[in-house]
Amino acid sequence: MVIFRTMGDVKLYLTHGGIWVENKYYGGNTNMVFVDKTLTVYELLVKVHEIVVCDLDRFVYELVSVFDTDGRVIRLNIKTDRDLHYVLVEANVNPPEIYVSVQEV
């Protein structure tokens, strides 16, 4: 986890342990991390696992970010590096928030 912030870092909220009700995530815990704008999904999953420890033989992480565009709420599943780049750089949300769900395999 990055402790000291650098010029290329983005503040990111990781929220986990809550529940989805339609397009809203309720409850849980939020951790703030600083990540590089070029962070990959794999690197993000490593950071998530440092915070949300679970048995990866039985569970997988689902990463989602929520955006309000012209009154329409969009849940973006973050599966690729391109998805993550959109959340961190292009979406103009400051700070971005990623919701972490743990799904049984």
Regions found by a protein language model. Give the residues of each.
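Phospho-regulated scaffold assembly regions enriched in serine/threonine/proline and acidic residues
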Residues: 1-105
